[in-house]
Design a protein with these regions (language model features):
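Rossmann-fold cofactor-recognition segment
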Residues: 15-28
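Conserved Rossmann-fold cofactor-binding substructure of NAD(P)-dependent oxidoreductases
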Residues: 25-40
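A glycine-rich helix->loop->beta "capping" turn
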Residues: 36-49, 55
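Substrate-binding pocket helix/loop in short-chain dehydrogenase/reductase
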Residues: 58-59, 66-68
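Active-site helix of classical SDR
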Residues: 82, 118
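Residue(s) in the substrate-gating loop at a strand-loop-helix junction
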Residues: 102
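C-terminal beta-strand-loop-alpha-helix "lid" module of Rossmann-like NAD(P)-dependent dehydrogenases
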Residues: 132-181
């Protein structure tokens, strides 16, 4: 098993995992990393696209450059990795691509609009990809976590522009997100769901048990009005 990090000096020691330095934002870095794995193993059976960035801020407060940076990692990073790996999967006529999305990919929240937009893009890309590659014995699937006690949410950057009219609601949502992350389960449940998505029977979408599974079901089966009201109440905006 191989993992990738932008800085090998910061890679954790994990038994059975060999880390390779790579940056999903850099086409050359991605190609070099994938080719180094192929040289050692001759194949790649499973690709998990888990790199991601989050940002808190109103849509109006977010510059095009900030949005582009988020899309570069969250969406184009998946595209770069997928394009690098697919030729080898097609050659072996088998493989599984697991793209880590988010509940926000189906249930967008205020002040996380650009992040939600990237995850909606991941959802659409993954469904289209799955249709295209199944003829080669390859399937693409999505994992949709909710809040998880990791640094992604806790250390999410804020949009640099601040518009006074959004201050109150933005601060309320920021505190709500921080509280939810503090009380959220650790990453183990998400990791288990990723393993199931990678090696279990194929499903287009997999959500960890608990809040993530509940929220995706609410979005799917309840009318938009009650879901909207419930979301605003949860974030402290009602």
């Amino acid at each position: 098993m191989f993992g990738t990090v932008r800085d090998l000096h910061k890679a954790p020691a994990l038994p059975g995992v060999e880390f390779i330095e790579m940056d999903v934002r850099d086409e050359v870095s991605v190609q070099v990393a994938v080719e180094s794995i192929i040289e050692k193993t001759m194949r790649i059976d499973v690709l998990v696209n888990n790199a991601g960035m989050m940002m808190i801020g109103a849509v109006e407060e977010t510059t095009a450059a900030e949005a582009a940076a988020l899309f570069d990692t969250n969406v184009l990073g998946i595209l770069r990795m997928t394009r690098a790996v697919l030729p080898y999967m097609r050659a072996h006529r088998r493989g599984r691509i697991v793209n880590v999305s988010s509940v926000l990919g189906v249930l967008p929240a205020p002040y996380m609009g650009i992040y939600a937009a990237t995850k909606h893009a991941v959802e659409g890309l993954s469904e289209s990809l799955d249709h295209e590659v199944r003829q080669f014995g390859i399937r693409a699937t999505l994992v949709q976590p909710a809040y998880t006690r990791t640094n992604l949410d806790a250390n999410a950057p804020r949009a640099e522009t601040r518009i006074e009219g959004y201050d109150h609601e933005r601060d309320v949502v920021t505190r709500s997100v921080a509280d939810s992350v503090r009380n959220a389960p650790g990453p183990r449940a998400v990791a288990s769901t990723i393993v199931e998505a990678a090696f279990g029977p194929w499903r287009m979408r997999c959500a960890p048990a608990g809040q993530a599974s509940l929220l995706t079901k609410l979005r799917r089966f309840l009318p938009a009005g009650p879901v909207d009201a419930s979301l605003r109440k949860k974030l402290g905006l009602a």
